[in-house]
Amino acid sequence: MSATTPLLESRLQSLPLLARGKVRDNYAVGSDRLLMVASDRLSAFDVVMGEPIPGKGELLTRMALFWFARLGHIVPNHLTGDAPESVVSAAERSQVTGRSMLVKRLKPLPVEAVVRGYLAGSGWKEYQHNGQVCGVKLPPGLKNASKLPSPIFTPATKAEMGEHDENIPFERMVEIIGAPLAEQVRRVAIALYETAAAFALGKGIIIADTKFEFGLDEAGTLTLMDEVLTPDSSRFWPVEGYAEGINPPSYDKQFVRDWLEQAVVDGRPWNKQAPAPALPADVVARTAAKYREALERLTA
């Protein structure tokens, strides 16, 4: 498989497949490690699109590795430092090179750690309805894309494949994982966001919001896992396109979301259930270009 061939699904025979997520295929490596292969699949509204985004898996992996290295002083991460190619057969290396991470097997927390620095997406919709986001009361008079007085932590429960993640108040997170761990996750997630957002702003990118995932290692240490600060887990806006009161142009999959919002299936708006309508070639190409530009801008 050449580097330019899109990978919709990995097919490794040398390792047992544990799960196919919306984007990543996870394989067991012994009892204590996982091989995470980032495919070129794209999901929006928790539905996986039928068309791969060429180069996406490699770009996601490069960006995640970039951030893991930059944020390692705040919290440990799941990387082992071992080469993904070392655990597959020679014939399978082309499926993993550049798009995989060999990571520690952790006990994942059942709550996603979402941090918002700006009002956007579901947060903006909820604010219009009741002046708050996930139980966090916000000042009146904010607009779509307004910068918040300070970043807010708005957890969500993890959805099963095909279901929608559900925003929950912090109090519910405390009930699920306990107060000490919930408070640690909130503190660490906000620190990660603030550090990354300040760096990205210096590169001309606003990180409006992002989602972190954490797990516990065998010693019970909180560990950053999965992906981090990629266009799949974050809303990235170029500073030159930013203004309050609009949906700023973005480097993430918002471009696909916007197209899907106006997509018609059988004469009706798409109901955000699988299967998704086929993405036009120009939407695929422009999305691939957005991912590429975000990485180039951040790492320049």
Curated annotation (Swiss-Prot):
One of its GO terms (biological process) is 'de novo' IMP biosynthetic process. Pathway: Purine metabolism; IMP biosynthesis via de novo pathway; 5-amino-1-(5-phospho-D-ribosyl)imidazole-4-carboxamide from 5-amino-1-(5-phospho-D-ribosyl)imidazole-4-carboxylate: step 1/2. The keyword Metal-binding does not apply. One of its GO terms (molecular function) is ATP binding. Keywords: ATP-binding, Ligase, Nucleotide-binding, Purine biosynthesis. It catalyses: 5-amino-1-(5-phospho-D-ribosyl)imidazole-4-carboxylate + L-aspartate + ATP = (2S)-2-[5-amino-1-(5-phospho-beta-D-ribosyl)imidazole-4-carboxamido]succinate + ADP + phosphate + 2 H(+). Coiled coil: none annotated. It comes from the Bacteria. Belongs to the SAICAR synthetase family. This is Phosphoribosylaminoimidazole-succinocarboxamide synthase. The lineage of its organism: Bacteria, Pseudomonadati, Pseudomonadota, Betaproteobacteria, Burkholderiales.
